[in-house]
Amino acid sequence: MESPIERFRLSQTAKDSLIKLKRYTKIDQWNILCRWAFCRSLAEPSLPSPVPIPADSNVELSWKVFGGEMADIFLIALKQRCHQDGLGTDKETLTQQFRLHLHRGIGYLAGDAKLS
């Protein structure tokens, strides 16, 4: 399945949070932590706040690296969540919602007292 999201860059705030998470969890790969964060946000019933998220860090991942062999499953989960939230599943909406869920999830993980 072809993803509408080819590459994405994290915000500096998200990068800093992931560095902290890497230290606490001993998980070295950005993509693994990003997968956890994305799923954590999808599990939250509320919509992520539609705030602008800067792409101001030097951490950039391709969709294939992010998703690995589960990339199609992550895309289906994103489309299902957009449908559930009454949003479209066009490229722009999917890209925006992915960024919002990813960054919200990183914030949730970084603030989880069980992980620090």
What are these regions (language model features)?
Residues 84-116:
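Low-complexity intrinsically disordered segments
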Residues 31-35, 72, 96, 100:
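Non-catalytic, well-ordered alpha-helical scaffold segments
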Residues 43-85:
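Short, positively charged interaction helices/loops
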Residues 28-53, 110, 114:
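Short, basic amphipathic alpha-helical segments that act as recognition/interaction helices
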Residues 4, 11-32, 36, 60, ...:
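Surface-exposed, Lys/Arg-rich phosphate-binding patches that contact polyanionic backbones
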